[in-house]
């Protein structure tokens, strides 16, 4: 991944903005990955495709959609879902200056709960510090482990 500023990423997003607003949320996961998620990762955030392994086998849990590689480490796993999966949390449930705890997210969005559990299982299997989920339109990230905290507190 090359260095970029938030302004450069925003300018890159603006070039692709119509793709996001016009996307059919009933599309399947593969189409969501091709048209939205890959656009964010490779065209907007400028990750190199050689730094991302797709469908990486993670022993028993299954296959991680995106595993990011930096040197010999895997710093991030991202689990993809189709655009129609909603990770919605009611605006009055959250504070703008604090992260959303997993327990609130799980209560408000079963789709987000199931995707985060899946991503955390993959990340834990690979020894990855961060896990994320996306439907191409919403992106959520968490630490896979924080000493002294349960998953509900993260």
Residue map of PLM features:
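A short, conserved, highly charged catalytic patch centered on acidic carboxylates
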Residues: 1-130, 138-154
């Amino acid at each position: 991944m090359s260095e970029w500023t938030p302004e450069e990423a925003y300018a890159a997003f603006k070039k692709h903005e119509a793709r996001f607003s016009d996307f059919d949320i009933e599309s399947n996961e593969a189409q969501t990955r091709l048209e939205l998620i890959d656009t964010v990762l490779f065209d907007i955030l400028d990750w190199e495709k050689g730094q991302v392994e797709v469908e990486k086998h993670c022993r028993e849990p299954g296959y991680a959609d995106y595993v990011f590689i930096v040197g010999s480490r895997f710093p991030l796993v991202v689990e993809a879902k189709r655009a129609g999966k909603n990770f919605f949390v009611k605006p009055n449930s959250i504070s703008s200056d604090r992260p959303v705890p997993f327990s609130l997210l799980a209560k408000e969005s079963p789709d987000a709960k199931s995707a985060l559990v899946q991503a955390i299982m993959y990340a834990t299997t690979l020894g990855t510090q961060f896990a994320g989920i996306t439907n191409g339109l919403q992106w959520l990230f968490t630490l896979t482990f924080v000493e002294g905290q349960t998953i509900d507190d993260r």
